[in-house]
Amino acid sequence: MFGSARILSDVTLRLRQNLSVHGVRVQNINIGGGVGGEIPDNKRLVYALQNLHGIGRSKAQHIVAELGVENKFVKDLSKRELYSIRELLSKYLIGNDLKKCVERDVGRLVGIQCYRGIRHVDSLPCRGQRTHTNARTRRSRKTFSGSR
């Protein structure tokens, strides 16, 4: 039973890493090394790094400049360059670690019942924005099960 689960997980991992959609091949390179994330290998390095949660345009350009690597396709990078990217990315708070940190910070605000925490609980903007005519997305009613 457990062997079949391992085989299935191995198959799904391979399918995720080499996915074909409408004849277009999409293959990812696992960053790993505590970073946790995959970047597509068919894009240039600056744009591929932006697929990681917590890395935007400026941080991706800063990373490439700090490494001194050309902005070439990820599939053309050497193993040494990939290793240096992993080392540099391990210094940043990205991916699930960043999501957990933000969630913990909001939970702290809710726990001490400050103004911002109360606004988070009420699903209202917490940085002084107008709510009479705007903030429709933030103010949208949450549907409860059993109500019409």
Curated annotation (Swiss-Prot):
Gene Ontology process terms (BP): translation
InterPro entries in the cross-refs: Rbsml_uS13_C, Ribosomal_uS13, Ribosomal_uS13-like_H2TH, Ribosomal_uS13_CS
UniProt keyword annotation of Transit peptide present: yes
PROSITE patterns named in the record: RIBOSOMAL_S13_1, RIBOSOMAL_S13_2
Pfam family name, one: Ribosomal_S13
Transit peptide: 1-27
One annotated GO molecular function: rRNA binding
Biased composition (Basic residues): 129-142
Family affiliation: Belongs to the universal ribosomal protein uS13 family.
Subunit structure and binding partners: Part of the small ribosomal subunit.
Record function comment: Located at the top of the head of the small subunit, it contacts several helices of the 18S rRNA.
Protein's name according to its UniProt entry: Small ribosomal subunit protein uS13m
Organism (species): Glycine max
Gene, per the UniProt record: RSP13
